[in-house]
């Protein structure tokens, strides 16, 4: 019988430990609280929801809603307890966070196959066949050093500096052009063009936009990390024209001239269905981001699948160090799960914990690890964080991660519904087969 350690009893660690234990294997679950706590946690309970009490939308035509349905098919502990302690929240699955965490703690502490060890892990525990690292965005300083040694220090990030991402289908490509600076590269960037008057309007709204206040434990990040676009703009009206909005080296084929200002959109995935605003990390409030960035002519009707942010977040560059099975490339006995892998949101974190647990169970049985089909939201997410790219920025579940349907469907909601039905059908097959 193999020995397994799960480090961290957040959403991902709780799911991983539960999956392994309910599959008949022993697991040691390490949690440093209350011996050592974090600036964001308030209790010693497992799966404590430190920000919102909402696990996102329930509708399967939302990324989060579809992912939770897939998790249900995989026997999710988090989803079942969330439903047990749900509170009215319109179309979202919100919970009584105290009862939710307490119940998960009870289930895991009382499971005969789970041994809970309350201590800070400062080095990789020895004597285990498999180790799942699920230490979350507020990983302790001591264990961060362990992760740095495992992954290479340059592949561990201590903050998110996230720029908004738009659905490529909603960009007006007539308001700009594809091309790289000085004609180098393969034309992977779409350049949204602004004239002087449009820039003036955009600039004034940007510097006056309402910002999200920084939490105490995030203060250092602001200075160490990338400067928010609005802070850069406040240094002077010309600053952006020599920074993220510089037009140098770009010629608009329509005019044969260099534009006054550009905002570059870069492909976020191979299919080019997701485009991110290059250098536009921001602390603007979400409604302000939509309002202000839609002043860019090409983005007038854009759908934002992810909005920008800058906050404290320990995460690895999974695309360089992990396989899609969530195993460490250089040591496949070690798996990562949760927000530390570069997924974003409660549901996505928990879902990767389920997958890590599934793969440990398979390997304990002498089988090869597995990945859900790319047509599923979980399959799309793990492929996104592990497929080759320049740099990984955390991603939430959204429909742009899923491959196109065989037939073109014009109606957006219908298209999402058909993708969701396909995903659930494929996940049902995966759920019935992963144990075999």
UniProtKB/Swiss-Prot annotation:
Keywords from the named record: Cytoplasm, FAD, Flavoprotein, Methyltransferase, NAD, NADP, Transferase, tRNA processing
This protein's GO CC annotations: cytosol
Known catalytic reactions: uridine(54) in tRNA + (6R)-5,10-methylene-5,6,7,8-tetrahydrofolate + NADH + H(+) = 5-methyluridine(54) in tRNA + (6S)-5,6,7,8-tetrahydrofolate + NAD(+); uridine(54) in tRNA + (6R)-5,10-methylene-5,6,7,8-tetrahydrofolate + NADPH + H(+) = 5-methyluridine(54) in tRNA + (6S)-5,6,7,8-tetrahydrofolate + NADP(+)
Cofactor: FAD
UniProt-recorded Gene Ontology molecular function terms: flavin adenine dinucleotide binding; tRNA (uracil(54)-C5)-methyltransferase activity, 5,10-methylenetetrahydrofolate-dependent
EC number(s) recorded for this UniProt protein: 2.1.1.74
Positions bound to FAD: 8-13
Keyword set includes Protein biosynthesis: no
Cellular location(s): Cytoplasm
InterPro entries reported for this sequence: FAD/NAD-bd_sf (IPR036188), MnmG-rel (IPR002218), MnmG-rel_CS (IPR020595), MnmG_N (IPR040131), TrmFO (IPR004417)
GO biological process, one term: tRNA methylation
One Pfam family here: GIDA
Primary role: Catalyzes the folate-dependent formation of 5-methyl-uridine at position 54 (M-5-U54) in all tRNAs.
Family assignment from sequence similarity: Belongs to the MnmG family. TrmFO subfamily.
Name the record gives this protein: Methylenetetrahydrofolate--tRNA-(uracil-5-)-methyltransferase TrmFO
Source organism: Persephonella marina (strain DSM 14350 / EX-H1)
